[in-house]
């Protein structure tokens, strides 16, 4: 398949450059020779952390998400800084958003969030051996979160209630559910 469906970029026009994303419009030549436009969101990428306490609870944060106009419960996450190793970002975001540090930070998977219009890749990690860090780095000045620790069953209920509503957190909870099911095989 690959190259058979490839689109050739003819022209790129940057429309907006902000603190988090850049927006561009590409003129492309389609495989059939026709031309079209593609609106693209450029994002530096992000990390997300499935943090598991010694009591086997999932550490999450509740925060207001303006695009959704509501608060949702999510796993800790944050944007990659230019040139930064995703593992370093994961360790930093875990500490900043939750006050926890960990003994083990293991990469799980990387995935595209919305490949139809954005190039954002999230690197998902699992953190274990958590302990509260004294004098932990705080939240960014524009972040306001509440810390929540949930059992797997509680997290599944939050998904049903749409309190957990974002893809990275749903993927994280489903991963934990799969791990639990595999234990009992």
Swiss-Prot record:
Enzyme Commission numbers on file: 3.-.-.-
Which GO molecular function terms does the record list?
Answer: hydrolase activity; hydrolase activity, acting on acid anhydrides, in phosphorus-containing anhydrides; magnesium ion binding
List, separated by semicolons, the cofactors it needs: Mg(2+)
List cellular component terms (GO).
Answer: cytosol
The record, for SUPFAM superfamilies, names: Nudix
Which UniProt key words apply to this protein?
Answer: Hydrolase
One GO term (biological process): ribose phosphate metabolic process
Q: Does the keyword Hydrolase apply?
A: yes
**Keyword Hydrolase (UniProt):** yes
Q: What class of enzyme is it?
A: hydrolase
Pfam families attached here? NUDIX
> What family name appears in the similarity comment?
Belongs to the Nudix hydrolase family.
Q: How does it assemble?
A: Homodimer.
| Functional summary from the UniProt entry | Involved in the activation of the NAD-dependent methanol dehydrogenase (MDH). MDH activation by Act involves hydrolytic removal of the nicotinamide mononucleotide (NMN) moiety of the NAD cofactor, changing its ping-pong type of reaction mechanism into a ternary complex reaction mechanism. It requires the presence of magnesium ions and is also able to use ADP-ribose.
The protein here is known as Methanol dehydrogenase activator
């Amino acid at each position: 398949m690959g190259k058979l469906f490839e689109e050739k970029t003819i022209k790129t026009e940057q429309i907006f450059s902000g603190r988090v994303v850049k927006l561009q419009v590409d003129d492309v030549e389609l495989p059939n020779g026709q031309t079209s436009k593609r609106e693209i969101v450029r994002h530096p990428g992000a990390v997300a952390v499935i943090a598991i306490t010694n009591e086997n609870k999932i550490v999450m944060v509740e925060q207001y998400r303006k695009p959704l106009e509501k608060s949702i419960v999510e796993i800790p996450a944050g944007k990659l800084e230019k040139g930064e190793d995703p593992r370093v970002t994961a360790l930093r975001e875990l500490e900043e958003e939750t006050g926890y540090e960990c003994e083990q930070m293991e990469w799980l998977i990387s995935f595209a969030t919305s490949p139809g219009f954005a190039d954002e890749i999230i690197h998902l990690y699992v953190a274990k051996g958590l302990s509260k860090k004294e004098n932990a780095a705080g939240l960014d000045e524009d972040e306001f979160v509440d810390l929540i620790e949930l059992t797997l069953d509680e997290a599944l209920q939050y998904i049903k209630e749409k309190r957990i509503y974002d893809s990275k957190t749903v993927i994280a909870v489903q991963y934990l559910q799969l791990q639990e099911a595999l234990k009992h095989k």
